[in-house]
Swiss-Prot record:
It comes from the Eukaryota. Keywords: Cytoplasm, Secreted, Signal. Residues 1-17 form the signal peptide. Coiled coil: none annotated. This is Putative neuropeptide precursor protein. It is found in: Cytoplasm; Secreted. It comes from Bombyx mori (Silk moth). Residues 177-191 have a biased composition (Low complexity). Residues 18-89, 136-208 are annotated as: Disordered. Residues 38-57 have a biased composition (Basic and acidic residues). The lineage of its organism: Eukaryota, Metazoa, Ecdysozoa, Arthropoda, Hexapoda. Residues 19-31, 72-89 have a biased composition (Polar residues). One of its GO terms (cellular component) is extracellular region. Detected in the brain and frontal ganglion and in the axons connecting to the corpus cardiacum and corpus allatum (at protein level). Detected in the brain-subesophageal ganglion (brain-SG) complex, fat body, midgut and ovary. Expression in the brain-SG complex is 2-3 times higher than in the other tissues.
Amino acid sequence: MLLFSLTAITAVLAVSAVPTPSNNKDGSTISELPENWDQTKDDNRSLFLNKSDKNDLEPYPLALSEEGNQDGYDQTVDQRFDSPQSNGELDNLIMRPELYGEPPAMEGLASAFDLQRRKRGSGTKVGGAGAATKVVTKSGSGKKNLKPEDQAALSPIDLMTQHEAQRRKRGSGTKVGGAAASAKTATKNSGGNKKNFRPISERRKRDSGLSAADVRALLNLWEAQERRKQEYANQFAADRYYGRVNPDEEQPEVDENGDLWYNEPVVIGPHDRDYPHHSYFSEQNRMALARGYPDLYQVGPNELAQRYEEARRKRQYANKMKRFMVAKKRSDNMMHQNNYRPRDDLYTLAELLRSAPRVQEQDIPVYRRLIL
């Protein structure tokens, strides 16, 4: 027993005497890392067994400092963002506040630009055949002789102000007639030939020989034409929705015999016999009748019945039994619950009445059944 105890103690002492494996040159342990140690720069002091493992964590230089040294990692982060002077190695260039400053004030730019423009336009060279005159004024009137590239640099407000000043100075007197009279003699200060000139506010761009009565007559004619256009437009819009309305055919409800006219048999004209009224083959005739023109296409009774039958077959069911079967299926509440809205019996009856064939008689009007 004593022999076993001595053997165990000897083994423990032998194990404790074995040096700790180290990957550093100076023999220090791995847990005791030197200060300012960077795993990305020194390959000899790397903790990775091979270089491939190190390359996998290359974008994360703080991976090791996060493990087991949370205080140091937080201190590094605080130092990176709060330090006024940084070495630049760990700066985040995307979130740097100096890269996202306020834009420069526009007032300063505008004043500098205006000052530069005034200096450039204070005196300019006036081109001529042999004379070079320099126009220098305190108010900057020399801007009227600016070069085209200088004028392009002016703002729109300055260009309009300059143009208005030139127009007023040039148009102080406008010549009306006479080849001998010169514009130089009609200035504000000189007496000038005032007969041949009038103020610019009274000049006319087009002088005509029309009298005042002629002008009024032309104005009345133009107003009547505009009113007529508006009446035609309104009448066409009403005819498009309500059919042709002729105000000349209006008559009182009670005639001279004392009878109500709508109780008597109605004789329909040849234009109103085409049915349906708003179909594709009667549209052109209705447009012509609304404007008072004769019928573009004369449609006979036989041709009219044939066209109506073709149109009815295209949009309605030809078989009566098939029509009722479809109506029965549509009225079933248990069918098509998800994608079909159930309809009541009144709606189905109205659909059947609308789709029923109707025959146009000679002098009996046919009324369309509208479902609201």
